[in-house]
Structures are given as C-alpha cells and as structure tokens.
Amino acid sequence: EIYHGERVALIGPNGTGKTHLLKVLSQEMAPTTGEVRFGPRTSVGVFTQINNRPDFLGRECISIVHDRISDTERAMKTLARYGLRNQARQKFETLSGGQKARLEILRLEIEGHNVLLLDEPTDNLDIESSEALEKALDGFEGTVVAVSHDRTFLAQFDRFIMITDAGEVYALPDFDVALRGLQLPQQLAS
C-alpha cells in the first residue's frame, strides 16, 4: 500500500520490471496477477523522458501554465518553483531537455494530479536541472512513485522497493539499505 504524500522509489537493476510496474500503476497495462486499486479522489499523472509534445510547439511556457492557472502572478510563482521563471516567455521547442522535463512535471501538478509516476525523471539532466526538479517536487503535496538510479534524487524518498534480477520484490527499511541492495535477503530476514 502507498499512502497520500509518500515518496516511494522503485529501484533495482535495468530490465527487472520497474518501468513495467509503473505502467501497471498508471493502468497503461493490466496486471498479470493481483490488482491495483486507488482511492476515489486519486488522479494519476505519468512522466516519461519522452518529450514529444506537438501541442506545445510554438507556445511560451507561461501560455502552457495559463491553460490551468489564469492568474499571471500565481503562474509565475509556479514557474519559479520549478526553476523556470526566466523561461516564462521562451517557446517550448527552445527549452533544454531538463527544462522540458520540469515543465512537464509542473503541467502534471497543475492539472490536479495528486499521484505522480516518474520514470527516470533526472535522466539526461544536468546537476542544476536535477536540483531544480528535486526542489519543485519538495513542494508537491501529493504522492510520488519514481523509478530512478540517481542516488542524489533517491535520497529524498521515504520508502524503497527493490526489484531483483530474479523478480523478487523487497520493501527496504531505509536509504542506506537501498544503496547496499545486493545483501538484501540476509538483512531483511533479521
């Protein structure tokens, strides 16, 4: 079970099914066993590193935010929280990959999603962009479930679920155990 406001990281080697699990949680794919249930007020938003947004081409950041936040001052504060205040008048296609990633997560938040599923959100981001994303997520009051291999990003999470090459799933007690990872069976048994 995952509760409102929790930060849950899905970790493990490449190819173990972490992204597949996100797709099941987003209801993009059906589970092969078990079931996924959400509370009645849950709204799930999904972030992937694919930034194909033809609907944003030719539009300024502030215009994209104005789709949901009509008050310009509030829209600018939201852009600032995501480190995008200086890009308010910049067209979407001129943004860096990191800026597009932050704008996409901002969009998910202002659309009213209270659960964010993030697939490698810091991949291909420079340090400054990654830090801006982390800061922005600190201000998000909903639940975040993320797949990541970024240790700095993972340090802000409350819970860790590790999926092994053998398909075993472990709930890890803390970040230090998550970093050690490979000694799991003995540590969790004690």
Name every feature range the model reports, one short phrase each.
Residues E1-S190:
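ABC ATP-binding cassette signature C-motif
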